[in-house]
């Protein structure tokens, strides 16, 4: 498997260039190949734990299992940590982090009628977000203050496929109309 920390450091050393939105978005979408490599490396311990979490009907027990999994497995996963670092480097290197992300995330909450934290899965499972929505959601996950085992939003969003869903949405919306929309709304 690639050393994602090393790749992240190499990206950080790339000289700054004026790139088009399309070029920058395509650099971000390339991250999906690293995700696939990571997903293909899941061992039986990951898969069986995920299966147990998914089958659990008791909501409280489900949260406990998820917390334990994050604490005992994911927090010690060097490759997941590297993917997290790599994604953050890509977002900043290619200037894809949205400054006004909270404004757009709040619009997403209204669009999907999301109030409770547990309902966020409605948005996070969407694969049809426009570019601004998808980039705002990625920035929101990246900048979240919850770095304890209970939350670890970006790492867990990478692990559980949420980031891949968002990147798939970005890949599907790289077109002239959406890029023009970004040019208007993103400074």
Where are these regions (language model features)?
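Long amphipathic alpha-helical segments
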Residues: 176-180
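Short terminal alpha-helical segments
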Residues: 3-33, 83-91, 96
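Short, charge/polar-rich alpha-helical segments
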Residues: 120-129
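Intrinsically disordered, low-complexity linker/tail regions enriched in Pro/Ser/Thr
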Residues: 97, 101-104, 108
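Amphipathic alpha-helical elements of HEAT/ARM-like alpha-solenoid repeat scaffolds that form extended
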Residues: 27, 65-68, 84-91, 121, ...
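Boundary/linker elements of alpha-helical solenoid repeat scaffolds
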Residues: 117-121, 149-151
């Amino acid at each position: 498997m690639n050393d994602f920390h090393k790749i992240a450091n190499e990206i950080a050393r790339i000289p700054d260039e004026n790139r088009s939105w399309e070029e920058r978005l395509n650099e971000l979408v390339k991250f999906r190949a690293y995700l696939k490599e990571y997903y293909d490396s899941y061992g039986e311990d990951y898969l069986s734990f995920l299966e147990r979490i998914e089958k659990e009907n008791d909501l409280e027990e489900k949260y406990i299992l998820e917390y334990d999994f994050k604490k005992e497995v994911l927090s010690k996963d060097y490759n997941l940590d590297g993917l997290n670092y790599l994604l953050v480097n890509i977002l900043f290197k290619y200037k894809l982090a949205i400054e006004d992300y909270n404004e757009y995330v709040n619009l997403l909450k209204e669009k999907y009628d999301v109030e409770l934290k547990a309902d966020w899965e409605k948005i996070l499972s969407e694969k049809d977000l426009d570019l601004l929505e998808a980039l705002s959601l990625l920035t929101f996950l990246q900048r979240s203050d919850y770095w304890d085992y209970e939350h670890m939003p970006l790492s867990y969003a990478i692990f559980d496929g949420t980031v891949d869903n968002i990147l798939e949405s970005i890949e599907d919306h790289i077109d002239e109309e959406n890029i023009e929309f970004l040019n208007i709304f993103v400074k």
